[in-house]
């Protein structure tokens, strides 16, 4: 692994009130509760809980602006990204492909190697389509995450909407930058800047090589890199320690089924305070499109300009 360089260590108080409402509250393990058995890594980090049944089981719906709402059986949807998803799992884009194959819509699309994503040329004769989506317990939010990377889950809301050509092309430009960065690094995912802003500490790491750890082997093909691999890779290098916790549900969100980062070094989630994250290009930082409620263990990354984990209280 390339040497990771710690460039900044400062003490900071994070203005959590400014970020109120931007993340689902995470429960934490209290002193009265019994910790589940943990897998301990070589550097002393811990992983609590195991992956359960996560494939979609129930009839889903997709709303396409101007065309109406369509129902689909998740057992009938197949993925076009077999390089990313295992059998039984699929993306938001795959739902559109399924509707096209079922004769319910007319979808023209192609794979763009320069962006590593499928592009919609037209849907029922019209171009420039994007999506609004959120998981159970969430709310509408802007996202610039690749549609064919975004895992579908039970009880999620999925809307396909027209956008301006300028907006769509600005998103596509960041995809090209990621692919160019990936190729320039000989097929390695090397993130120029990884930022951790905890309750008590702030770290900035430069040129972090992020390796796949196959934390979600039931969903993703071996070697697929996700945002949470950033934290695990820093742990492998001895630069941080962490706790990961599997959650079946969180608060009003019945369908979570993901690992969350509960601790980084001495900062551990408590009550309504904990870590959230974002990843992508600086052009779409925070609510511009990079900060959304895709759990970091299911957010596939190519070579984003930055990954940031930060502390909030809601």
Task: Describe these PLM feature segments.
Residues 1-9:
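Bacterial N-terminal signal peptides that target proteins for export
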Residues 8-17:
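Sec-dependent N-terminal signal peptides
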Residues 16, 20-314:
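Ubiquitin-like/PB1-type beta-grasp interaction modules and other compact soluble beta-rich domains
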